């Protein structure tokens, strides 16, 4: 039903192209010389693009065109003007009144006004001497040059149409000693057919897919209902890929651990888009130069027990995670599918104080973003990370695959998920198991309450 639905890259293409067509009637721009007092590309616009746009808008990345040079940017100025005025680009969905984030890619009003004024004046190029030095990007990577690259053992054939079940493949690292990973990036070779990829670390002796042979693609039955508990998988979430999700580069002194003899388990969700292609995803790792002072672990608050009624416009689902040891909360990542409407993270401290740290009032499932806290939060034992999400299963949701369906947890786009991922920073002498709740408590979804 929804196998042709494409995510992130298509979302970017549709946004940009629709905006471009929308401005065709305004193509009679001023002369390229423009107003003498108008902003210029080299002096005023290029620095904004370097800071906020070029990580995606450059050759080989997810965006459909490059913004590295004036010549590459100039044909798209009309679309740019509308996109920044409507705050469609760069993609950023956090409520500006709640929380502050180190990776906030949204434009300030001054930056928006600069781009709008530049386009209105005819997009003058300006003095080449004003052009800032090119940003330093590693070709083919969003991380520093990888120390190790691990790749799928062979290409996977993604068909022209139909549904592709989640694909898994185990790739041995060959590490003979423990490695501390300071930066990691997953790069598919065919981004347009990838819904998401997760690279898990499977330690020696783990029961996680213990009967599967390395180097061979296989499918796994999806978790259901009370068995859905990604906070307690017998593997470690290393890094993920989804449209709009940048590479993971941890601060100095922090790293994720990959033990000697570990394997990487790739989970790949392909979505056919009308063209048969071959994908051979790779994973780049950059190692810390010395043992870190802090270890980083990706965990989650998750609820897989919900049943969203047909037509419900505002169904509420809650999940929480209780802290056992003192940790630092560094970043958060809400995850839902097409019916996702809004998402909120709160911290409830042992004394009862509640603090809202992220509110996404208009969730956009095409963009799977991490939000890095500008000031990480120390969480004492007994604190809780609480997540609340609402889903719109009504006909008024243009993304809804089928408003007549009762929706439960599932892996495909037409199913739903409710996961609040987060990165915890902690003493490396602790085990990840020390962070997990002592007793599994399955979150219960609450009935829909309009307006809540």
Model-derived features: positions:
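Alpha-helical and His/Cys-centered functional microenvironments
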Residues: 9-10, 24, 200
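N-terminal secretory signal peptides that target proteins for export/translocation
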Residues: 1-13
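Long, low-complexity, intrinsically disordered segments
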Residues: 446-452
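Aromatic- and Gly/Pro-enriched helix-to-coil junctions and flexible linker segments
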Residues: 29-175, 183, 187, 196, ...
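His-enriched metal-coordination microenvironments in redox/metal-binding proteins
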Residues: 143-433, 440-441, 451
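Bacterial N-terminal signal peptides
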Residues: 14-28
């Amino acid at each position: 039903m929804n196998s042709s639905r494409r995510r992130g890259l298509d979302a970017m293409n549709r946004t940009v192209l629709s905006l471009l067509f929308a401005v065709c009637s305004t193509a009679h721009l001023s002369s390229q010389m423009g107003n003498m007092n108008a902003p210029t590309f080299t002096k005023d616009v290029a620095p904004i693009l370097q800071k906020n746009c070029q990580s995606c808008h450059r050759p080989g990345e997810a965006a459909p065109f490059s913004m590295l040079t004036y010549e590459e940017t100039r044909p798209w100025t009309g679309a740019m003007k509308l996109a920044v005025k409507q705050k469609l680009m760069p993609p950023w969905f956090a409520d500006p009144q709640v929380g502050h984030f180190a990776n906030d890619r949204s434009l300030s009003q001054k930056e928006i006004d600069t781009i709008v004024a530049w386009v209105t004046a005819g997009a003058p190029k300006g003095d080449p001497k004003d052009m800032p030095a090119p940003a330093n990007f590693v070709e083919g990577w969003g991380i520093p040059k990888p120390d190790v690259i691990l790749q799928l053992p062979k290409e996977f054939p993604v068909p022209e149409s139909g549904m592709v079940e989640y694909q898994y493949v185990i790739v041995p690292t060959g590490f003979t000693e423990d490695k501390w990973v300071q930066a990691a990036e997953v790069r598919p070779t065919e981004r347009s057919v990838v819904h998401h990829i997760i690279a898990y670390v499977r330690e020696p002796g783990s029961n996680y897919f213990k009967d599967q042979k390395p180097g061979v693609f296989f499918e796994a039955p999806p978790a259901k209902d009370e068995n859905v508990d990604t906070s307690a998988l017998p593997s470690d979430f290393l890094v993920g890929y989804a449209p709009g999700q940048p590479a993971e580069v941890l601060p100095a002194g922090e790293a994720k651990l990959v033990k000697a003899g570990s394997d990487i388990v790739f989970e790949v969700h392909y979505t056919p888009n009308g063209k048969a292609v071959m994908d051979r995803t790779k994973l780049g790792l950059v190692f810390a130069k010395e043992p870190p002072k802090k270890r980083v672990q990706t965990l989650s608050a998750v609820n897989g027990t919900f049943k969203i009624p047909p037509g419900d416009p505002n169904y509420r689902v809650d999940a929480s995670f209780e802290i056992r040891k003192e940790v630092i909360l560094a970043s958060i990542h809400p995850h839902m599918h097409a019916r996702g409407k809004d998402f909120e993270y709160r911290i409830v401290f042992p004394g009862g104080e509640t603090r809202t740290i992220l509110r996404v009032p208009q969730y956009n499932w095409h963009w799977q973003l991490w939000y890095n806290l500008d000031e990480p939060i120390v969480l004492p034992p007994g604190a809780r990370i609480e997540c609340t999400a609402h889903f719109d299963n009504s006909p008024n949701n243009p993304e809804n695959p089928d408003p007549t369906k009762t929706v439960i947890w599932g892996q495909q786009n037409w199913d739903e998920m409710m996961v609040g991922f987060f990165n915890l920073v902690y003493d490396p002498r602790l085990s990840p198991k020390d962070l997990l709740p002592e007793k599994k408590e399955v979150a219960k979804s609450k009935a829909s309450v309009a307006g809540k």
